Amino acid sequence: MTRDFDVIVIGGGHAGCEAASAAARAGARTALITHKLATIGEMSCNPAIGGLGKGHLVREVDALDGLMGRVADQAGIQFRLLNRRKGPAVRGPRAQADRKLYRAAMQEAILNHRNLEVIEGGVSDLIVEDGHVAGVIAEDGRQFRARRVVLTTGTFLRGVIHLGTQRIPAGRVGEAPALGLSDRLYGLGFQLGRLKTGTPPRLAGDSIDWSSLEVQPGDDPPVPFSFLTTEITTPQVPCHITRTTAEGHRIIEDNLHVSPVYSGQIEGVGPRYCPSIEDKVVRFRERDSHQIFLEPEGLDDDTIYPNGISTALPEEVQLAFLKTIPGLENVVMRRAGYAIEYDYIDPRELRPTLETKRLGGLYLAGQINGTTGYEEAAAQGLIAGLNAALAERGAEPFILDRAQAYMGVMVDDLITRGVSEPYRMFTSRAEYRLTLRADNADQRLTAAGIGAGVVGERRVMAYEAKARALEAARVLCDGLRLSPTELARRGLKVNQDGVARTAMDLLAYPDIDAGVLAGVWPELAALEPHIAEQMGIEAQYAGYLDRQDADIKAFRRDEGLRLPAEIDYASVLGLSHEVRQKLAKARPATLGQAARVDGVTPAALTTLMIHVKQKRSA
């Protein structure tokens, strides 16, 4: 049996759900093929969404009418805005999520999605015709045809679970790995590597002595992810904090020989910024304790996720170590932690649309590209799914650059620099983070999403209403003006320099907000809280943003010089052999991308720019 679609998405995880939804929203007849319908939207590791850098990605996915932010708002049982004491540019929204509620909400969205058909089954092979993907073959022999296929295989490509000395072929606990696809991709010439990630043991909440632990409450009121969410209605619960001990570290040290991470059993490289507890103990021997966050997995499930102690030690060693932790002296371990090793493809094989250079019509998103994290996967899924749909109807691709979005930063990092370890997003990766804030993701991206046809009517209306409210607030704040003397009479002390100040000028002062100014100008009290907050942020950053805008214009000049796709770097006189090799492998699309290839010097860029301009004028 053969069936035809415009876009086929393989995998029902975070990348796959966003890819399928984006393609369907953009008008493509879309199929999502996944091993089990019941595991669509599964949170395979930690029960949380967002964080520093990651929360920015969730807001950007939401600004483009993606699913993750709205689903997290429905499932969130504790919300916290991280870095609240720092500037708005580096604040990151984060939420603990009830696993069951998250999965149920995502399945509700996917299974009832317009233009989207969900098909249960594994995929064993790609159909390739004349150097272009033409569909997929299911494990049971069914064929599904499409000229655009998005692979979002997560940790399933030749996945192997490691627990002590045990090696268990699996893509996730209890689920078989994808073997045929790995072989097929290798046969097509893709460069595959191995990475690994890990997860901590799961604990029985009723076996923990909560009275001895530090409580970590959420924000009140909670700050939602989605620009469409007006209120969080799910009950909120606290997390708790404890620490490892020197005794526990000794147990780990004594058993490193049976840790697959240190015995040589695992070949893949793990995430630098989410190390196992074995790695922490070995790399930071001077520390006698490490912080652990005890995170609830659900409202009606007392399973606890101990964030910070990912491990693949044997089960009996894990339990012995756990019992040395304050509050866990009598803990019951419901499931042991483990490491999982899997194949990924060098992301330098990709175009900015996340289509592979090697095989037309094939798009990759998520951990198959060497990233780690739900949020990174979701963002890539949206980009890949949307571009697959746009390509199918012959429309312009949807490409975000480093000055537009964290999504643009991530994709650019992946396709120009590649990965040597699992890639995760941080605010420090973005050069223009004053502009790329979580609070303004809709202002930055929703209009572009509307232009690409991926944004629904409800969000269009909300976006336009907010844009009107922001513009009205700017006009109001710029129009309210008083002299220093008049301000002093009203209790606001500013320099008596004779220069009148507007409400917008005053909002730049660290101790003045719209609430304070409402005592001077009562009309400001009518501003909605999120609009008033936006005015304060814009005022606070005004001078800095002017300077950053100049930097962005310079960046765009470099990005504007496109490099010919057929350029022969061996013929560019003045480039070193090393630089020629690196540029030939990366195939950057612009001079700006070439600048971000490791090892390419400013002198090499000048040489390359002169060469390209001479060729064009010849």
Curated annotation (Swiss-Prot):
Keyword Flavoprotein: yes
Pfam families cross-referenced by the UniProt entry: GIDA, GIDA_C_1st, SAM_GIDA_C
GO biological process: tRNA methylation; tRNA wobble uridine modification
Superkingdom, taxonomy of origin: Bacteria
Sequence intervals crossing the membrane: none
Record GO terms (molecular function): flavin adenine dinucleotide binding
Chain sites annotated for binding FAD: G11, G12, G13, H14, A15, G16
Assigned GO CC terms: cytosol
Keyword field: Cytoplasm, FAD, Flavoprotein, NAD, tRNA processing
Signal peptide: none
Subcellular location: Cytoplasm
Residues given in the record as NAD(+) binding sites: 270-284
The keyword Acetylation belongs to this UniProt entry's keyword annotation: no
Cofactor(s) annotated in UniProt: FAD
Function per UniProt: NAD-binding protein involved in the addition of a carboxymethylaminomethyl (cmnm) group at the wobble position (U34) of certain tRNAs, forming tRNA-cmnm(5)s(2)U34.
NCBIfam families, per database record: mnmG_gidA (TIGR00136)
Family of this protein: Belongs to the MnmG family.
Assembly: Homodimer. Heterotetramer of two MnmE and two MnmG subunits.
Protein name, entry field: tRNA uridine 5-carboxymethylaminomethyl modification enzyme MnmG
Highest classification ranks of the organism: Bacteria, Pseudomonadati, Pseudomonadota, Alphaproteobacteria, Hyphomicrobiales
